[in-house]
Each structure stands twice: as C-alpha cells, then as structure tokens.
Amino acid sequence: MTQYIWIDEKGNKAYFSDKEMTIRHREDGPALETVDGLMHWYNNGLLHRTDGPAMYIPYEYIDSNGKLIVHKIRIIKWFLDGKLHRVGGPAVIYPNGDTTWYHHGLLHRTDGPAVVDKNCKSWYIHGKLHREDGPAIEGIKDYKRDRWFIHDTHLTKREHYEYYNPPKKQTININGKGFTLEELNALIETAKGNSLPF
C-alpha cells in the first residue's frame, strides 16, 4: 500500500493512505505524531489499534509564571474501529487517575463502575446507567449525590429496593389450600352467588 506523509515545519507528522491526504492510515505506528508527544493510531481513517491504546494525549498546563508545562503523563485512550473500546480495562485513563470503561463506543462495565473520578463512581451497562446492588451514581465524598437507576430509569432508593426485592404475596389458607388475595377475589367473582369450591 502506498503511504503519503505530511510533515510540517515543526516536525509534526501525519500518514495517509490516499494522495489527497484525507484518510489517516498507518500500519506500523501512529498515523499522527506531534513534537509534544501526541500520538494517534488510525486504520482507514478511523482511530484504531489492537495492540495498545490508539491515542496518547500529552498532559499540559500553564504554570504560575505563564510557562507551558508538558508532562510525559498523558491521557491514554483505546479505540477499535473508531469507537472507544477496551476489554479488561478502562478505555480512557486520565493523568489524575480518573478512568472510563467503554465497549464498542458505549460506557460499559459488568464488574464495577464504568466511570471513576474524584467525586463519584457511575455504573453503566451498554451505555445506560444501571446497577442492581446499589446506587448507579455513587458520591465518593457525599452520599447525597447517590442516584439509583435500572436500565437508565431513575428510581428512588425504595423503588430500587422493591424492584429487586418484591414483596412476597400473602396467602390465605382455607381448608389446607393456600390462596393469594388475587386468586381468592377471582374465585368469588367467578362464583357469583354459587357456592365456593372450598
């Protein structure tokens, strides 16, 4: 495959698969590299890498003297076919330790929170807020931020509890046979003046 390379006056490089230089593509390394350490892997124009993160973003800030500081610590992102995706770990890792887990472009994690930051944890399944064993949004320092969701539907704490722990139906024993209140009402309605079967 023919490779087209663009290099600017600072030394930033971009690799393309087409002569018009519109489709970023490189098979043996990042298709975009900047002198400050930014690296993006592309396959046929889509962010994509199977053997590691597809995006390294330098962490930079301006210090109190107005000087731009660029750290080696980076925001790291995994992509597959242009979508944030990683199996077995977070798809995005921030320099401060915050993480987000994605599966084929959707926030998703089955064994813990899909979003972890300094203020809260959030549980997602297939892009929807969802947690069975507690609040789907959990405040780390402030429990008042806790929010309960099932399949992206907001519930109160009590509604969430009752959804997973429905009240048991009470039965009424008549002549050794147990009837729920609904069953007993149905029998009475069916009998309509006739004798009941017990």
Residue ranges and their predicted role:
Residues 1-178, 183-198:
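Glycine/tyrosine- and acidic-biased, solvent-exposed loop/turn segments at the edges of beta-strands
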